[in-house]
């Protein structure tokens, strides 16, 4: 299989190629890494590339073939750094096979809010509506801290109505209030403007700006 030519410029620069070669050379000295096996399985599946990162050029066109392989090695890896890298292969709309392991990873890493934030970002890109209850359960749990932010946005993006009472509550949560404003505006209901208006006079410019944007979005949809 040939890669998507329009994406190959990203890896054509010699400096970038050398960096990726050096990285793959380091794999030889790490017996715990799953990345060589991941690369081998993609090559065995018929993809043509020199460096693992170049296989991203096949996406999203060949996602049906790549997704099960990528999810397999995401689950096998014991390294957060590796998992951060592997999730690049399924950060696309519709990669629903990746959702359960991503959610499991969040639940196992409650004490790592930045990592949970990144996992939530991947879930936001995938946008699978069938796990809305699980997203909401995480969003409701303040122990995840900022790790909830992208799932708050996701609940708005998929317009999950049962989440609305929680989203309104989150307007008083400093770790998720800005995202809650955006999520509430996704429902485009004029009835929700009253929850956002108090923030127009906030001392925090970020709150004022986000409230203005959210209200404007609702009013535009109502016209």
Residue ranges and their predicted role:
Residues 1, 222-223:
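Short intrinsically disordered terminal tails
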């Amino acid at each position: 299989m040939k890669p998507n030519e329009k994406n190959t410029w990203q890896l054509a620069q010699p400096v970038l190629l050398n960096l990726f070669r050096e990285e793959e050379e380091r794999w030889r000295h790490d017996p715990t890494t799953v990345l060589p096996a991941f690369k081998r399985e993609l090559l065995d599946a018929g993809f043509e590339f020199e460096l693992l990162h170049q296989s991203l050029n096949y996406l999203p066109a060949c996602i049906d073939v790549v997704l099960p392989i990528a999810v397999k090695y995401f689950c096998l890896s014991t390294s957060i750094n590796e998992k951060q890298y592997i999730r690049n292969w399924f950060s696309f709309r519709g990669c629903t096979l990746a959702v359960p392991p991503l959610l499991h990873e969040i639940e196992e890493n409650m004490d790592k809010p930045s990592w949970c934030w990144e996992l939530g970002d991947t879930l936001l890109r995938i946008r699978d509506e069938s796990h809305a209850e699980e997203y909401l359960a995480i969003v409701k749990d303040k122990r995840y801290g900022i790790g909830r932010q992208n799932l708050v946005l996701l609940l708005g993006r998929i317009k999950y109505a049962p989440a609305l009472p929680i989203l309104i509550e989150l307007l008083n949560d400093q770790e998720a209030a800005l995202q809650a404003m955006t999520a509430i505006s996704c429902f485009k209901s004029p009835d929700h403007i009253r929850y956002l208006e108090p923030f127009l006079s906030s001392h925090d410019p970020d709150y004022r700006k986000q409230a203005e944007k959210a209200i404007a979005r609702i009013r535009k949809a109502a016209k």
